[in-house]
Amino acid sequence: MLQKCKLEGIIICNEKRLLGAAKVKSGRTLSGALLGTAILASGAGQKALAEETSTTSTSGGDTAVVGTETGNPATNLPDKQDNPSSQAETSQAQARQKTGAMSVDVSTSELDEAAKSPQEAGVTVSQDATVNKGTVEPSDEANQKEPEIKDDYSKQAADIQKATEDYKASVAANQAETDRINQEIAAKKAQYEQDLAANKAEVERSLMRMRKPRPIYEAKLAQNQKDLAAIQQANSDSQAAYAAAKEAYDKEWARVQAANAAAKKAYEEALAANTAKNDQIKAEIEAIQQRSAKADYEAKLAQYEKDLAAAQAGNAANEADYQAKKAAYEQELARVQAANAAAKQAYEQALAANSAKNAQITAENEAIQQNAQAKADYEAKLAQYQKDLAAAQSGNAANEADYQEKLAAYEKELARVQAANAAAKQAYEQQVQQANAKNAEITEANRAIRERNAKAKTDYELKLSKYQEELAQYKKDLAEYPAKLQAYQDEQAAIKAALAELEKHKNEDGNLSEPSAQSLVYDLEPNAQVALVTDGKLLKASALDEAFSHDEKNYNNHLLQPDNLNVTYLEQADDVASSVELFGNFGDKAGWTTTVSNGAEVKFASVLLKRGQSATATYTNLKNSYYNGKKISKVVYKYTVDPDSKFQNPTGNVWLGIFTDPTLGVFASAYTGQNEKDTSIFIKNEFTFYDEDGNPIDFDNALLSVASLNREHNSIEMAKDYSGTFVKISGSSIGEKNGMIYATDTLNFKKGEGGSLHTMYTRASEPGSGWDSADAPNSWYGAGAVRMSGPNNYITLGATSATNVLSLAEMPQVPGKDNTAGKKPNIWYSLNGKIRAVNVPKVTKEKPTPPVEPTKPDEPTYEVEKELVDLPVEPKYEPEPTPPSKNPDQSIPEKPVEPTYEVEKELEPAPVEPSYEKEPTPPQSTPDQEEPEKPVEPSYQSLPTPPVEPVYETVPGPVSVPTVRYHYYKLAVQPGVTKEIKNQDDLDIDKTLVAKQSTVKFQLKTADLPAGRPETTSFVLMDPLPSGYQLNLEATKVASPGFEASYDAMTHTVTFTATAETLAALNQDLTKAVATIYPTVVGQVLNDGATYTNNFTLMVNDAYGIKSNIVRVTTPGKPNDPDNPSNNYITPHKVNKNENGVVIDGKSVLAGTTNYYELTWDLDQYKGDKSAKEIIQKGFFYVDDYPEEALDLRTDLIKLTDANGKAVTGVSVADYASLEAAPAAVQDMLKKANIIPKGAFQVFTADDPQAFYDAYVVTGTDLTIVTPMTVKAEMGKTGGSYENRAYQIDFGNGYESNLVVNNVPKINPEKDVTLTMDPADSTNVDGQTIALNQVFNYRLIGGIIPADHAEELFEYSFSDDYDQTGDQYTGQYKAFAKVDLTLKDGTIIKAGTDLTSYTEAQVDEANGQIVVTFKEDFLRSVSVDSAFQAEVYLQMKRIAVGTFANTYVNTVNGITYSSNTVRTSTPEPKQPSPVDPKTTTTVVFQPRQGKAYQPAPPAGAQLPATGDSSNAYLPLLGLVSLTAGFSC
């Protein structure tokens, strides 16, 4: 079985058979071509780094920050780190791998010479196999092994020479030794026989002497054993008795110890309690002594000392008694126990008597209530108090009378001054009102002018900016146009010439039968990204892995073979994924091969579809594709399973593996483990290509490759149902028949079978075989092309059993093969633009359009604002008289308090320490009797020892001929390499954190080269740099002397080649090890939240290569960083709070309210940072771009604290009216961070960046800045929203906070004139006539406070300065809720509810001033989530003729707001005619001037009264009003 693997054209893969063996595709050349293509296509573009420029703007409040895909709101350098280049990925995947080695040569001349001589002496010489000393890595290990080998060669030579000499000497010595030994053997044997005869005679004599003393010894021994038994029994009895006595002693001793311990414990506790009690009594005595008279104290002290001496004497007697009893206890235990009992009884009786006595003393103390001396003092003080009280009362009465007289005079003068000032004020306010009205009109007109001017300026600046950009682009395009046009014309001319030449050869093999240029360049996209949408099911990567694992042989050999994948393993419920998951030879399968692209990395997403279901794939990040020279940005494919497919999977499922590279296409399979007859599988492909502007590309005869269409005896691969026109390649087996593209006339599998001219696979004996390979010269044999037009195209591709297309009669017969045999229902195909015909020219140049110069916009003419009129000068008012000062009353003397008398207490005597029992005497052990002495057995004379037969020395045999062996060694070395990563201060930063824009240096170090190495002819180091790393090539060259440095921008790789001088130094003495020098890469890291991983490759003499270790460093802003657990997004945060610390973001804020902005300086992600001093000196700043048009700074309230609540030191704050007003250093700092404040702003600056870094940054300590700002009063008059944003700037990198928006409600109080106090009656008689003596109301409608406001109301009042010459306040007013109110406890007060009881009024009728104020506790009880608005009705009576104007002031939380002005007129009343009984008479009552009003809770619908209590005229008010109404 074979899965075909190709990268170009429409590639179709299915089951193949070839004589029972696997069909192997030619892949070596293709792999090399792919590698070259990948190297050219995968360059990581570099971005120029300039602090003065950036890619985003934050000058407008609504401008979004670019680059937020990093998760960090960066204002400069916001881009996300690109994917690593394929070179970097491959290099790091092979980290520490080595290829080849450096051989080491050690001289063998000494050993060679030594091996020649031994044979002359008869010694055998043999050479062993060469010993491999291995391949070592460290050079010092090689330096160690070389002397070892050299020493061993010398040792082998010496051993050979020594073995030869030794053999010669051994042969001569052997014969002399043999003669000597034979002589010694004969002498020893004769002496032994003589000694043996003498010994035998002496043994007989000794036996006769030993038979006499034995019986006596045996009798003594028997008596000894009898005595021993008796003594042992006696000793055993004695020991038993001692043991019993010892046991009784141990028990008694333990009992006595316990009893004594208990007695001692009880004594010590009693003593401690007594001491504590006495200490308490002493303290009480000392306190009493301090409060009592000295004489009484001294008397009691003398008594105490007397009693104390007595107690101490008693205690001494007790101690003596205790000592006596203790001595008696130690003499006799039984008597002591009896005495102890008697002593205890006596002690307890004494203790009881003592307690009774103390109780009696306590009772006597309580009976004593006073002290005679203290009582006398108290009575004297009381008499003096009564005398002083009478004098004070008399003086205060006279003082009050004097004050009342002065007060009357003051009030009279005050009334006169106030009346005069009121008249002057009224005239002034009318003038101010007129001026303000005029200025309001001018201000509104000027505001409109400013808006029109600003809009005109903004439009102009936008047009001018766009014009300048277009002009720059125009100039650039104009400069480039001639070259582009010439290049395009040259290419078109070359294509035209090529097509003319091809027309001559169009009927020759391999040429397009209809010559055409290829306008579609679409061959390879390894970096493409794919997104999927499907009505089928997405599959998990783990499900694919499990399914491939059932192909055990290939899977165990790390080969992924889709052709063998069984679809049934993908049909489990838990195989379904919720999102796209990629699978392939990457990740944990890096290094595996696939039948799609051998060892190159392949990724694919998987879906499970049924007939008629689709998957739509969108391919982006295309790098290499063009149409007519114009970049292709996106391709969209819709893959649909053809409903007419005849595969036989019972579930109807088809697996689609959709490759991330769109030119690799799709693998489709319904294979369930069995070959199927009469089967087929087809996939419809609908596709659209898009240009760089996102517009569909309208193809005009673009060519799409149809390649590798195989036909065997039982299987046909084909294309059908396509939107284009088929173009045949001359000589190809592929044609078009019945709307299908396939090998129509012959098979094309094997030469000679079914008319095939070539074999699809390579055969060494067949020229032209192997056509089914992308790089085969005759790959056109199985290919064709389709010419496509229009934006939307389609083609269906698949594989089918031959029986579905042709009858058996139409099929060629191949001997030994069955045309109806089953096949796998699967296919791999791809669509791309690589046409297999020969010499097809490609269109690579886009036809340039002549640039058109843009038109410069005209600057607008701005309108001029009008000047405001001057306000009138406020008159000078008479100062009011100073109120009389009342002399303060004399203070009433304090009445003395009668004392409480105390008496001292006596000390309690200490308890007597008890006596203790004497411990028992331990028993004495009886000593054991001594055992009898055992009799001594008599000694016997030993028998003489017989002589020992001598050992005869063995005669040596002949000397054996030695074999001397020797061997040679071979040794190789693989010098190691090390990559190090340093900051600008040369500190190691591997697996650590440094700031964005930091300089990062990579040092490429190589170990010493060993002695005995071959000559070094080349020494090259290649470093594929990480994406987002900005190489400084010039600095790199300076830091790398001894190397030539070059940079390939396409692959983002820097290469170091040793100079001739460096090579000469390495080769100066090959017999000695040599140290290497190393180059250094210098550059900057440019991305937030990025990890920069890197290694390099060393290649020596093109024979030894090694890849280094991997180093990595991370920039802040990356969550879940395994190297830096504290790393996280850089998110400065801003929140608005009220004075109680409640967050008020988004809430309505009243004018005059202080916003407590809380700014978070987010530093926790920098914990453990290893940035260099150079970038630390760029500083640390926090910028608050506050709305100065709405807020006033409260710099006196600014606070900075750290995460632990401690005050932050070393940070200065400054505020600037605008960017232009800031110092140049601040402007430069903001410019580099790409931050443009809209107006005024604050800057918090770390005074000493290094100290700030050490204290807060490297420790990851977040800081909190509280910067209060008060809403300007004017905002309440106009209303409107204001917004606030902040920025933190760390290491020169800016990050934007969230935007905080609040709204200031417009407080717009209104005033009406009404005839009723009914809130439901909205009739307003403003501007109308009020009859003389008519009662009416001023309706004061307070400003509305919207719901969800930021802070509690604490002030809400109505101040009405009415014209008292025409209006008279009746003393009545009402307050009503204008909107529904919700209190904090949940109570709801409906609109229209009487709120008068929650108010209080102050009335000044003389000056026509009434102030109605809501009580603060009521206002604070209203929930901030509730709206608030109230209205007040002031009842008035018209008392004069004329026109009267009235305005009131609504005060809300300290800010005043003026209402509109109402005007009413009263004409002269008509003169009454003679009195007629039917005529109504008007009665006028003049109320007396009242006092300030304090309302009581409302009762029913009664009006509150503010006048004198004798307002008897009130019942007639209705009559008066009615009469007045008809009097004119």
Curated annotation (Swiss-Prot):
Motif window: LPXTG sorting signal: 1503-1507
Compositional bias (Polar residues): 83-97, 124-133, 1459-1468
Pfam families: Adhesin_P1_N, AgI_II_C2, Antigen_C, GbpC, Gram_pos_anchor, Strep_SA_rep
Keywords per UniProt: Cell wall, Peptidoglycan-anchor, Repeat, Secreted, Signal
Localization per Swiss-Prot or TrEMBL: Secreted, Cell wall
Residue span(s) of the pro-peptide: 1507-1528
Disordered: region residues: 50-156, 840-951, 1459-1480
UniProt biased composition (Basic and acidic residues): 142-154, 855-879
Modification Pentaglycyl murein peptidoglycan amidated threonine, positions: 1506
Family: Belongs to the antigen I/II family.
This protein's name: Cell surface antigen I/II
Gene name in the database record: spaA
